[in-house]
Amino acid sequence: LYLAAYTLTDQRVVDELIAARDRGVDVAVLVEGGPVGGMTERQATVLDELTAAGVDVRVMTGDAARFRYHHPKYAVADDTAVVLTENWKPAGTGGADSRGWGLTTTSARVADELAAIFEHDTTWQDTPTWEAVREEIETVEAEAATGSYPQHHPPVSTTADNLTVLAAPDNAESALVERINNTDDELLVIQPSIGDRDYRLLRAAIRAADRGVEVRILLSGTWYAEEENTALAEQLRERAADDNVPLNVRVAEENSRFGKIHAKGIVADDTAVIGSLNWNDNSAENNREVAVAVTDDVVADYYREVFIGDWQAGGDGGGFSLLPSDELPTGLVVVAVAVISATALLAKRWLVFAER
């Protein structure tokens, strides 16, 4: 059982990892040693707890680290894998703040590919054990999110065969550009923020609109991103109006469905892409990121429905008429190839994270 994380503080997840280890399962965890703002005291306590239980806890850290940040959010249990946009903490998998997306798949091929990434990332000098670096890492105090949001998007299941693992700094950005370049009808993008107007993936989305693809981009309105996101949205809407192209951008405010946008995904015709990749150069070129692309009508329609509901619930301008409003569910998202928006669902014999 492997779990890859940027941050890890969700006690339910920790308890299940320890329970698996107590059953004799080989359990390994890899986390980022220097997340933005510093490692929290809560996370240090969690890593102590896991180590004491016999879990192999590794930390990506040091001047020789291969990646700027170890930023993926995935888990592998036998031949089942979970890939998330959300961190393993109350605000993310705990359902207490962020809108996120996620996917559970029983594809042995996908599980094997993710396991290979995990093993590659944990077998070098920049991933020492937690015990070895515990005294070197300074921690900070931080309060956990405590919000509560109803879930109105039940999981859906499908038998999708076309799944592709994407990783940065390897193939993720180029694969997404290719996918966007091949989009014919509709492109939906959800991101906390976008690096700048000239970012490669944004340019691909603008080109799609220029050739007639209906493009919608939903960004976060949280305090640390609102000003830049609003400015970008206004620039792109003005450009779309001047050129009369089907491009709209909206900044989502906090609402009854979520506290902030944290999902990183697209729906491009019948393909959905879910993962940790932010739309900026650092994420694509310097971080370890993981995503999965799924070509399947059921999955694409599910995320599309969630996107539209979020667009209508908390935007700052621009209409969206792809579905009548009375057909749209509201609330948090969980999908079982599965979508997850604030709660992690890994349904295999080693782990069960209860939906709430």
Residue ranges and their predicted role:
Residues 56:
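Short, basic/aromatic beta-hairpin or loop at an interaction surface
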Residues 2-53, 66-70, 76-356:
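Charged, low-complexity intrinsically disordered terminal segments
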Residues 59-61:
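Histidine-dependent nucleotide/RNA phosphoesterase domain, centered on the 2H-phosphoesterase fold
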